[in-house]
């Protein structure tokens, strides 16, 4: 894993941390319990059938949902997070707000393309 990919994965994991993250470690599905920064690197504490301490990001892959798996109900809910305002020319503009990105994180959608980069795995139905 190159430094750019490592940074992208760390940013993604940190933004999803409050919502719970299931990751693959070796051949096990485990949950991220804690993310720590020490001596210039990030370390993860993971729990499953046992607790794993000091795991480097290179050893894990989060389970994420492709945007294409969004249900019609989820799409409607997601649209409610958009912000709209009128500019000085009277044109109404709609954009993704912080709440939109937070919603995607909370629902474990892969909006950064991590699955295509082989940095994440596609979540199974009803995994989250």
Q: Which stretches of residues belong to each language-model region?
A:
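Structural boundary micro-motifs
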Residues: 1-128
């Amino acid at each position: 894993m190159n430094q750019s990919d490592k940074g992208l994965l760390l940013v993604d994991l940190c933004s999803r941390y409050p919502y719970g993250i299931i990751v693959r470690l070796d051949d096990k599905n485990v949950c991220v319990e804690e993310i720590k920064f020490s001596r210039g690197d990030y370390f993860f504490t993971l729990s499953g059938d046992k607790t794993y301490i000091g795991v480097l990001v290179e050893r894990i892959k989060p389970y994420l949902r492709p945007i294409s798996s969004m249900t019609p109900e989820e799409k409607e809910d997601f649209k409610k997070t958009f912000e709209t305002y009128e500019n000085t020319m009277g044109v109404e503009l709609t954009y993704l707000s912080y709440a939109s990105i937070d919603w995607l994180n909370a629902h474990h959608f892969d909006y950064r393309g991590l699955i295509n980069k082989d940095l994440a795995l596609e979540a199974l139905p009803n995994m989250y």
